[in-house]
Design a protein with these regions (language model features):
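Aromatic-lined substrate-binding rim segments of carbohydrate-active enzymes
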Residues: 151-218, 278-303, 351-354, 358-360
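Glycoside hydrolase catalytic-domain groove-lining segments
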Residues: 154-156, 298-304, 319-391, 408-419
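Solvent-exposed, low-complexity, repeat-rich "mucin-like" stalks and linkers
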Residues: 501-534
């Protein structure tokens, strides 16, 4: 996951007279043409700013992501002890017993606060996943989570009740500075993964461990080498990575965590652990995969190995990546993709990429990360990565219903393409203080913001400059006070759907254009969008006569005209 901070924009429904809401007609007249105001494309304008170079046998100077930590320059050469790789018969797995409580999926449609279209043939084994890595830091900061009954309870119980069957947890090698201060973002070390993983296992959910093989965020813009591995050559680093994987995974399994999938690397399009040449990255991947295989054998369970990439919308990216993995003999079971609809193109393209991997290489595919906002508001005063109309995808509003629709539709597209399932990214990352409060001391102390100032010693170019609070709270599936949203129930409602009283979701603004000097024809109807999209309809509209008369099509400009919907069946606020 990468972060982009943007100023939030909040749109409000306009009202006319006696509290009645209206639809609005937005127009602009410029460069000789009367046209609708720009609504944005639903894509992130910064998504390509980190560069598009493919990992491969190119010069390291040509690669865009940060790989070696800046502060490491000029350090003396360190002598590293030789690491002997443990085989399965040298690994001791004696899992702690955890009493497990499970929750069944419904056997028919449910009544809910949202409408969910059923996916008739979806399997109960379809991965309904949630990345919940920041939970412990959020809780340590004083925030609380609640169940659907409004009572405080373990967030993992709430997730399981909502149909989540898989939890994804990131692991950083050493996310602390020399004084033990956490870098933030959840301070996700192995001990944190163990504590959260045990709680997930307690409620019957499988666990995916996401090794970043870095001390902090690893994504296409940066893949910093862990501090302890600085100065290592490739062979030493491969051995260290193997040992870290074996030791960490063994500790997690022995704690009783039901690990069933392991990611070796996170969004590694541009490199991993400071390596950028694909031949070198492949050696690290093979070391990580081999470590998982040996631990899996020692544990007597089938732990799947996943490799994780993003930017699947870029032409040729997936084909080049998978060809390189095959060329260098990387052993893996699952091709994991990040798919954020506001950054990574259409669902149809996502399906095509998945089917290409399946058909060409016989690998399974999972969506390792996705999300969508339920509001454009900011919950903690620190700004959000996704906010405003320009970040939204056509047809999916920033509402609880819009979030539910997006998750349901991504799951439907994934199921149609024989994808294993979907992990929602950080749906539990909520604010730890109100937006109008100074929460910085809490973020610094407990690591509940995306980065703390202490991370600057490790990542001075990004986190060290732009540290702060949670940039994802408006995409969580809990509100700003920790109460679950109805959209969280989509996981349990995928197969049979959910019904809700028919309600208007929005009345979108209408946009028209005409040439300068031409006659302007205003539309006679406006669309009314419902929570059940099959009920959407066109309704007659009367535009404000005074505002309409003020339009001069002989002069370039922009105009906004309010209109009244003519339908007695609509609630008064929408007429």
């Amino acid at each position: 996951m990468r972060f982009y901070l943007k100023k939030a924009l909040v749109g409000n429904l306009k009202k006319l007279g006696s509290g009645m809401a209206v639809t609005a007609l937005s127009m602009s007249l410029c460069a000789g043409v009367l046209s609708g105001c720009d609504k944005g494309t639903g894509t992130d304008s910064n998504a390509g700013s980190s560069g598009n170079m493919q990992v491969g046998e190119s010069s390291a100077d040509d690669l865009k992501p940060e790989t070696e930590n800046p502060e490491s320059e000029g350090e003396s050469i360190t002598q590293f002890p030789v690491i002997e790789r443990k085989a399965a018969d040298e690994i001791e797995i004696n899992p702690e017993k955890i009493d497990v409580t499970t929750f069944s999926l419904p056997d028919g449609p449910e009544e809910s606060g949202i409408f969910v279209q059923p996916i008739a043939d979806i399997s109960d084994d379809f991965i309904r996943g949630m990345d919940a890595s920041a939970v412990l830091a959020v809780e340590n900061s004083g925030a609380k989570y609640y169940g659907f009954d409004g009572e405080e309870q373990d967030v993992f119980k709430t997730l399981a009740e909502a149909g989540v069957n898989y939890i994804r947890l990131r692991v950083w090698n050493d996310p602390y500075d020399e004084n033990g201060n956490g870098y933030g973002g959840g301070n996700n070390d192995v001990a944190t993964a163990i504590e959260l993983g045990k709680r997930a296992t307690q409620y019957g959910m499988k666990v995916c461990i996401d090794f970043h093989y870095s001390d902090f965020w690893a994504d296409p813009t940066k893949q910093y080498v862990p501090k302890a591995w600085k100065g290592m050559n490739l062979e030493q680093k491969s051995d260290a990575l193997y040992d870290f994987t074996v030791t960490s995974l063994t500790d997690i399994l022995n704690a009783g965590v039901d690990v069933c999938m392991v990611q070796v690397g996170n969004e590694i399009n541009k490199g991993m652990s400071g390596e950028t040449f694909m031949s070198s990255v492949a050696e690290l991947l093979k070391a990580g995969s081999s470590a998982v295989r040996e631990v899996s054998k020692a544990a007597g369970k089938d732990i799947q190995v996943a490799v994780h990439y993003t930017d699947i919308d870029k032409q040729g990216e997936v084909a080049k990546i998978t060809a390189d993995l095959d060329k260098y003999g990387v052993d893996y079971d699952i091709f994991a993709m990040s798919y954020y609809s506001f950054w990574h193109g259409s669902m149809e393209n996502m399906q095509e990429m998945a089917e290409y991997v399946q058909d060409t290489y016989g690998k399974k595919v999972v969506i390792a990360e996705t999300s969508y906002c339920y509001t454009t508001e900011d919950g903690d005063g620190s700004g959000n990565s996704v906010s405003g109309d320009g970040d939204l995808v056509d047809g999916y509003d920033a509402t609880v219903q819009g979030q539910a629709d997006m998750l349901r539709d991504i799951c439907a597209a994934a199921d149609e393409a024989d994808i294993m399932g979907v992990f929602y990214w950080e749906g539990t990352w909520i604010p730890v203080g109100p937006a109008d409060a100074d929460n910085s001391s809490i973020w610094e102390k407990y690591g509940s913001g995306w980065a703390s100032s202490y991370s600057g010693s490790y990542d001075p170019k990004d986190a060290g400059k732009y540290y702060g609070g949670c940039s994802w709270d408006n995409q969580a599936m809990f509100d700003f006070t920790g109460h679950p949203l109805d959209s969280l129930k989509v996981f349990r409602e995928l197969k049979y759907g959910a019904t809700a009283p028919l309600a208007v979701e929005k009345v979108p603004d209408v946009e028209v254009s005409c040439n300068v000097g031409a006659e302007l024809a205003l539309p006679e109807t406006a669309q009314v969008v419902y929570n059940d999209k099959t009920a959407n309809r066109e309704v007659p509209v009367v535009w404000d006569a005074e505002q309409t008369a003020a339009i001069d099509t002989n002069i370039g400009g922009s105009y906004q005209v309010e209109g009244i919907l003519q339908d007695e069946e609509l609630d008064e606020e929408y007429r």
